[in-house]
């Protein structure tokens, strides 16, 4: 019996779904449609030229194999996209291998969040390119996007995608040398190597990676020796065809004091920007998060949270956790009326000034503004000063040197160190994370009050 084009494609999808990892199937295969079937060839339509190109390089062989299994004979495969680009594939000689083989003996990466996988990442219009690019890198490192530079604000999913690459690659190839490090860790390793006279060991460690994932690269600004060492590490890996993925809160050209040669290297691949998620994506994120927490949320609650928490995913998920915790403790039903008081959605924000932050920090930690601007190393003053620098960088557009000036003329490297330290601590210390959230709320409330007076 002769198959219709749609019947053939349905069978192709069923077989591919059982053979491919779910993220790969959903991103590359599931979005494609069959356009034409003749006795000589099959035309497949991809959603856009980006997906078309990846299908051509990585999936035509397996599609051709499945089509031949179903039909009992081979036919040519042609690709087209909804935007009019076409690639003709005649036979199997032009089809790329499905997965390249990597070998290695290095230990697996450490400190990966088990939740940061592709299957738990919610794709929306704000992050579709970044998601597709990271998945492409995970499947075929060193081929299409090298380096891959992810940029976007705090809490938008850059770290999630970077660690998803590591999880995916290690699941497929457990012996792969995949290194995930923060810029702070790279710098600390370099400092330790210098102190212990073991620079060669440091270089051999990083320069034998198959995939190097470096988070928060913006903190390399002002660190001249770290930039020098990273430049040579980057070159060694890139020339060997190894994959480098970098994440930052801003594009390369906007990182202060970053050397031109690094800006050039970081810009030579793909720069994928991650934007703030739209309402539909925020609702999907909340729904998925609730499912993982085994909670059923009414649609009106999801819509309420998604409507009022718009800045980033971290803020959004934090609101959901507060809601679930409150309902669990109080025993109340999950309604907007019951949750509205505890959620306290953020309001319109006014201008946040350095003076505002200094005064709030001084009041909270019972120190004076002069203490914050001074050089005292007393633990309580030093911590308050570091938190103040962290919050000033988070909530203002001031440069590092300008923030240093607001704290009594501190060097920009001191500001960088303080930001790095608090940023790392808050990821491990729940109390500190909550304190920072509360301080941020106070800053925004005060700025709004200041705006209306």
Curated annotation (Swiss-Prot):
One of its GO terms (molecular function) is lipid binding. Residues 73-110 are annotated as: Domain II. Gene3D superfamilies: 1.10.1750.10, 1.10.8.60, 3.30.300.180, P-loop containing nucleotide triphosphate hydrolases. Its main location: cytoplasm. InterPro entries: AAA+_ATPase, Chromosome_initiator_DnaA, Chromosome_initiator_DnaA-like, Chromosome_initiator_DnaA_CS, DnaA_C, DnaA_dom, DnaA_N_dom, DnaA_N_sf. Residues 111-327 are annotated as: Domain III, AAA+ region. ATP binds at residues 155, 157-159. Belongs to the DnaA family. This is Chromosomal replication initiator protein DnaA. It comes from Gloeothece citriformis (strain PCC 7424). The gene is dnaA.
């Amino acid at each position: 019996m002769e198959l219709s084009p749609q019947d053939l494609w349905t069978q192709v999808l069923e077989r591919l779904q059982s053979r491919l990892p779910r993220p790969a199937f959903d991103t590359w295969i599931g979005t494609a449609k069959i356009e034409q079937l003749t006795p000589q060839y099959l035309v497949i339509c991809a959603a856009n030229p980006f997906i078309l190109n990846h299908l051509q390089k990585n999936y035509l062989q397996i599609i051709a194999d499945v089509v031949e299994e179903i039909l009992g004979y081979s036919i040519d495969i042609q690709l087209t996209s909804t935007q009019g680009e076409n690639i003709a594939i005649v036979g199997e000689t032009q089809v790329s291998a499905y997965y390249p083989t990597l070998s290695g003996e290095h230990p697996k990466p450490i400190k990966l969040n088990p939740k940061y996988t592709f299957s738990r990442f919610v794709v929306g219009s704000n992050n579709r390119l970044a998601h597709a690019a990271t998945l492409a890198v995970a499947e075929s490192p060193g081929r299409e996007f090298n380096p891959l530079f992810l940029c976007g604000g705090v809490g938008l999913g850059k770290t999630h995608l970077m660690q998803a690459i590591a999880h995916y690659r290690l699941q497929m190839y457990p012996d792969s040398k995949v290194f995930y490090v923060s810029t702070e860790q790279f710098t600390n390793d370099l400092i330790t190597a210098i102190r212990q006279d073991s620079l060669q060991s440091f270089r051999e460690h990083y320069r034998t990676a198959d995939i190097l994932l470096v988070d928060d690269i913006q903190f390399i600004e002002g660190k001249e020796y770290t930039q020098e060492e990273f430049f040579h590490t980057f070159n060694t890996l890139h020339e060997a065809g190894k994959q480098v993925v970098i994440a930052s809160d801003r594009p390369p050209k906007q990182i202060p004091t970053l050397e031109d040669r690094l800006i050039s290297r970081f810009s030579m691949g793909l720069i994928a920007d991650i934007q703030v998620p739209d309402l539909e994506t925020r609702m999907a994120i909340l729904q998925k998060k609730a499912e993982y927490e085994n909670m059923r949320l009414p649609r009106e609650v999801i819509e309420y949270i998604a409507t009022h928490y718009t800045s980033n995913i971290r803020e959004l998920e934090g609101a959901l956790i507060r809601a679930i915790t409150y309902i669990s403790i109080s025993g109340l039903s999950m309604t907007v009326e019951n949750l509205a008081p505890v959620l306290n959605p953020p309001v319109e924000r006014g201008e946040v000034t350095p003076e505002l932050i200094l005064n709030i920090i001084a009041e909270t930690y019972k120190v004076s503004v002069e203490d914050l601007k001074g050089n005292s190393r007393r633990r309580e003053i030093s911590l308050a000063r570091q938190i103040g620098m962290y919050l000033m960088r988070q909530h203002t557009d001031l440069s590092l040197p300008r923030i240093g000036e607001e704290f009594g003329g501190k060097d920009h490297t001191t500001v960088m160190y303080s930001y790095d330290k608090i940023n790392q601590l808050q990821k491990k210390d729940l109390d500190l994370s909550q304190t920072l959230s509360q301080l941020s709320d106070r800053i925004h409330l005060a700025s709004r009050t200041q705006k209306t007076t």
